[in-house]
């Protein structure tokens, strides 16, 4: 819901291509109604949206739902990003000492870091990997390792992950795609094993850093 309200041009692009766009949680699904009853006034979360999407897909003939982050096959698919970055570094004759990426559920972070991280595991490299997560949703920094659901309503299979709890309702921030309660299972295990560090950053600090970077560049 927060993205629906904050980013009107995105929904207009979708509507241009014929989509019907509904903010989540909504009154259009049973799970949406339950979430709104339990959390009146909530701005929603990725977990809420997943629950509603799963219900819609499973109750509409001919439709399937595919999770776009968190799960291992998604994280590994995204590594094309890091493989390209690795090749670019090779062409430049350099190699990173640190790799930093934002972290919501893990697909973006895994995509850029995993190709480099394998060299720490197999070739003795000492690159540092830092997951930057929002302070309002610090699943890697403060979450507990558990088997948890990937959505608010508990419709997905249980997933081993660092999690704040599938019922966690994060506060409203601009980067709505990072407002997810858990981390992908491979990333969660690598955090537990000490291969990945995490840092939880407040939104205001992020904006200040973005402005500094833009002006310095």
Residue locations for each model-derived region?
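Alpha-helical scaffold elements adjacent to nucleotide-binding pockets in ATP/GTP-utilizing enzyme cores
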Residues: 9-13, 84, 115
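Buried hydrophobic positions in well-ordered alpha/beta secondary-structure cores of metabolic enzymes
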Residues: 14, 53, 85, 99-101, ...
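Short glycine/serine/threonine-rich phosphate/pyrophosphate-binding segments
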Residues: 5-8, 102-113, 139-141
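Active-site-proximal loop->helix
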Residues: 1-43, 139-152
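A glycine-rich, Thr/Ser-enriched phosphate-binding loop motif common to dinucleotide/cofactor-binding enzymes
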Residues: 69-84
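Short Gly/Thr/Asp-enriched flexible loops that form oxyanion-binding sites at enzyme active sites
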Residues: 85, 109-119
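Active-site/ligand-binding loops adjacent to catalytic centers
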Residues: 34-73, 93, 118-121, 126, ...
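Short helix-loop-beta connector
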Residues: 91-97
């Amino acid at each position: 819901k927060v993205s629906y309200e904050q980013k009107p041009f995105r929904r207009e692009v979708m509507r241009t291509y014929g989509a019907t766009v509904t903010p989540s949680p909504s009154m259009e699904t049973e799970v949406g109604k339950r979430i709104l009853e339990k959390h009146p006034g909530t701005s929603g979360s990725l977990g809420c949206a997943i629950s509603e999407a799963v219900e819609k897909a499973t109750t509409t003939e001919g439709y399937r739902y595919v999770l776009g982050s968190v799960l291992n096959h998604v994280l590994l698919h995204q590594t094309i990003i890091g493989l390209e970055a690795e090749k670019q570094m090779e062409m430049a004759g350099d190699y990173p000492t640190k790799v930093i990426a934002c972290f919501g559920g893990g697909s973006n972070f895994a995509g850029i870091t995993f190709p480099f991280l394998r060299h720490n595991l197999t070739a003795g490299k000492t690159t540092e990997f830092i997951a930057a997560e929002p302070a309002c949703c610090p699943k890697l920094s403060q979450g507990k390792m558990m088997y948890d659901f990937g959505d608010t309503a508990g419709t997905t299979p249980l997933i081993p992950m660092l999690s704040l709890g599938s019922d966690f309702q994060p506060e409203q921030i601009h980067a709505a795609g990072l407002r997810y309660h858990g981390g992908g299972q491979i990333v969660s295990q690598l955090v537990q094993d000490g291969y990945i560090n995490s840092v939880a950053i407040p939104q205001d600090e992020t904006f200040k850093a973005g402005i500094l970077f833009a002006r310095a560049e």
